[in-house]
Amino acid sequence: MKGHEFRRACHNIGGEFIQISPASKNCINIMEIRKNDKTVEDVIDGERAERSELSAKIQRLHIFFSLLIPDMTHEERQLLDEALIQTYAGKGITHQNESLYGETGSYKTMPVLGDLYDVLKKSTETRRMANILNRLVHGSASTFNQQTNVRLDNKYIVLDISELTGDLLTVGMFLALDYVWDKAKEDRTQEKAIFIDEVWQLIGASSNRLAAEFVLEIFKIIRGYGGAAICATQDINDFLSLDDGKYGKGIINNSKTKIVLNLEDEEAQRVQHILNLSDTEIMNITHFARGNGLILTNNNTVTVEFKASGLETEMITTDREQLREMIRRKQE
């Protein structure tokens, strides 16, 4: 969410900063079926029975639309499924993976949200969904109605969704994570890490089970793709708010290392129960100064002080006084 806070560090280490917002020119096409390089998998595991790439994409799209239209009925979900299949068929794409390729051997041009909108608006039964989708097609968020125009080839990438608000925030967060997850699965021999700030947006009460299951699945299986998943949240209550904390606890249980910073008394008590911390450790957590924390890993707990170098501080600080001092030095 606070991607702009990573901008300085990203630029200083030669990373790629990608802003996703209605005002940005950057776009990730949620309808895009991305080409997977399965060369490594075939070498390691041998050839396997192919799955339908279209079916896999439509499953993800159902999560996207469940966030965009939270009150979607069972009937509308079925009608949406049919509309999605029809939309891809309009581009010559079917459940047969061979249909993804054009005459030149590259993937065909993918549909965009506007193509789905045109299908939905034809029927009175799906017009409500079309009306809601219209904002992303012809309205203030129409930048989402384009082909993907960003690339994830850099070693360090920040996807900034901080300018998205309201219901678009959760939708945008899923959009970015869906794209990153596809990239992470490309090659199991390459190390990678996914950092998700304010993950409660996708696993908390403002989200739903489909999106939360998607996030939890990443934490469960990313090690099998040679990667790591790291998340952060400032509100443990939001983190544990959906389905009695099922997804938040699932992420914690699938995380080898946990870092706990300063917490209020109520939140500290919840953490104590989940992480089996002692009363002394909880007392420390509620009195931690800025920069102090508790690390839990391999059944060990260690109290630490995180110290950044001068350069690191300049790249990541959000402290107002430090920012003023940086401005003063640069203006001299």
Label each region the model flagged.
Residues 16-20, 228-232, 258-262:
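Short hydrophobic alpha-helical runs that function as membrane-insertion/retention elements
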Residues 222-239:
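Sensor-1/coupling segment of RecA-like P-loop NTPase cores
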Residues 187, 239-332:
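C-terminal regions of RecA-like/P-loop NTPase motor modules
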Residues 163, 200, 235-237, 265:
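Active-site-proximal loop/turn and secondary-structure-junction residues that shape catalytic pockets
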Residues 4-24, 29-227, 245, 284, ...:
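P-loop NTPase motor domains
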